[in-house]
Amino acid sequence: MFERSRYTIDQIDPEIFAAIQKENQRQEDHIELIASENYTSPAVMAAQGSQLTNKYAEGYPGKRYYGGCEYVDVVEQLAIDRVKQLFGAEAANVQPNSGSQANQGVFFAVLKPGDTIMGMSLAEGGHLTHGMALNMSGKWFNVVSYGLNAQEDIDYDALEALAQEKKPKLIIAGASAFALRIDFERIGKIAKSIGAYFMVDMAHYAGLIAAGVYPNPVPHADFVTTTTHKSLRGPRGGVILMKAEHEKAINSAIFPGIQGGPLMHVIAGKAVAFKEALSPEFKAYQEQVVKNAAAMAETLMARGLRIVSGRTESHVMLVDLRAKKITGKEAEKVLGDAHITVNKNAIPNDPEKPFVTSGVRLGSPAMTTRGFKEAEAVKVAHLIADVLDNPHDEANIAAVRAKVAELTKQFPVYG
């Protein structure tokens, strides 16, 4: 028997407890601007830490290979129903353990090794699972990539011409470092014109889409994949939305195709996050996410930094650092020293190596969760510029760090 009072983390494993405590303090003390990170609610974390972690449940609600699944069936069905409502989808699979596995599930359902797929170039803002050479998608399939035009928007004309020429079996839309609105309807029509499947990976934009502040790809795509964290503010995991005609193939591809028993405690966390995302408060939050990103981008441009594409229409932006004569790797380090967390990121046609880069990627979801509004977003942008204007002055870094501390104390993550 486990006595709850005796089996606490601090008593059983002080080393892990200490690391958790330090990470909690880091999250409170640092301004988080990594676009793919956010803070889950205590309710989501409670679901993930529940007894549901004990239950094996291979299969799907009502069709399990294990007994004792009557309550986890309720949990999974709620997650399915809520995510369908959230995005207006005909069918959904909530079992993928990650966004990458959601993408793999679609590939396993409709592709064979050697088939041609078409996705956005990683170097111009795409994602490694959309055909990057070292990824499974690049090793198993013949990959053709589309990119950006001179205005650093997706080159839809070139995309269409390439699709007509190469006739891919699957066209993928979605990005990990692209700030503008994606014309899912147009790409969907291109896919339909050549008889290709159309998959959208909306992992970065899912929260915005749920709130109606970014175009919804669901009406235009055969498959829509997403993570459940990032802007959606749920647990780390994945989901596949699909047309009803593809439900059987996708379900078989996930189980038994590429996964075994689902993580029921994570699915519970997903269900809670979907309920939160259906609320009016979540819509207001996402509206503020977009406002904060725009305010930050405008301020950075006023301070002499170039924003790739000239603006942001979402939660994310790429900052070209070459005018400041600093690399993305260096900027990530000095901003981190000032307690502003960012990630280095390649810009289009980047002359630097991928581990060095000429840019950083910034996102507004996490700071907006803290309660930051436009005024704070402007302050944060000025603090970033202050660091980049004088990155090797320790007194300057210390002064910025002190100003960051004032903001983080005023806006705690978990009050």
UniProtKB/Swiss-Prot annotation:
Catalysed reaction, written as an equation: (6R)-5,10-methylene-5,6,7,8-tetrahydrofolate + glycine + H2O = (6S)-5,6,7,8-tetrahydrofolate + L-serine
Residues with PTM N6-(pyridoxal phosphate)lysine: 230
Binding site for (6S)-5,6,7,8-tetrahydrofolate: 122, 126-128
Annotated signal peptide: none
Keyword hit for Transit peptide: no
Main location, first listed in the record: cytoplasm
Metabolic or biological pathway, per its Swiss-Prot or TrEMBL entry: One-carbon metabolism; tetrahydrofolate interconversion; Amino-acid biosynthesis; glycine biosynthesis; glycine from L-serine: step 1/1
E.C. code: 2.1.2.1
Any one Gene Ontology cellular component term annotated for this protein: cytosol
Cofactor: pyridoxal 5'-phosphate
UniProt enzyme class: transferase
GO molecular function: glycine hydroxymethyltransferase activity; pyridoxal phosphate binding
Compartment annotation: Cytoplasm
An example Gene Ontology biological process: glycine biosynthetic process from serine
Keywords noted in UniProt: Amino-acid biosynthesis, Cytoplasm, One-carbon metabolism, Pyridoxal phosphate, Transferase
Coiled-coil features, chain-numbered ranges: none
S-S bridge residues: none
Site residues (Plays an important role in substrate specificity), renumbered to this chain: 229
Subunit structure: Homodimer.
Job description of the protein: Catalyzes the reversible interconversion of serine and glycine with tetrahydrofolate (THF) serving as the one-carbon carrier. This reaction serves as the major source of one-carbon groups required for the biosynthesis of purines, thymidylate, methionine, and other important biomolecules. Also exhibits THF-independent aldolase activity toward beta-hydroxyamino acids, producing glycine and aldehydes, via a retro-aldol mechanism.
Recorded family membership: Belongs to the SHMT family.
Designated name of the protein: Serine hydroxymethyltransferase
Organism expressing this protein natively: Ralstonia pickettii (strain 12J)
